[in-house]
Regions:
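Low-complexity/repetitive intrinsically disordered segments
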Residues: 1-9, 95-104
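Conserved core positions of repeat-based scaffolds
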Residues: 15-18, 27, 56-59, 68, ...
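Short glycine/serine- and acidic-residue-enriched loop/turn motifs that recur at repeat junctions
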Residues: 29-41, 70-83
Length: 104
């Protein structure tokens, strides 16, 4: 989009995910496993980090929660629930796995 700026980009095997300066995320490329189906945000929420894996995408939200979409053959989009007071601070998607850094 003309006039839209991006703050982060991550390339997977056949898809790319971008973080826009307004806190929304967009993805393009092969969507065979739903890796480009970025979940909509709740009001007042934004994405703060994006990471594209092999056939999945992981996103960090402004409230410290994480969400993922796409291929789940190895459980790579299963995001563990956190105890109260703990949040995710960083996300990274590998070929068939996801790494989530916690605040504790």
């Amino acid at each position: 989009d003309e006039g839209t700026s991006y703050t982060q980009v991550s390339a997977g095997t056949t898809h790319t995910v971008l973080l826009r300066s307004d806190g929304n995320a967009v993805a393009c490329g092969n969507n065979e496993d739903g890796q480009c189906d970025i979940p909509p945000l709740d009001a007042g929420m934004s994405y703060t980090q994006v990471s594209a894996g092999g056939d999945h995408t992981v996103l960090l939200r402004s409230d410290g929660s994480a969400i993922a979409c796409g291929n789940n053959l190895f459980g790579q989009v299963d995001i563990p629930q956190l105890e109260q007071g703990i949040c995710y601070t960083q996300v990274s998607a590998g070929m068939t796995h996801t790494v989530l850094l916690r605040s504790d």
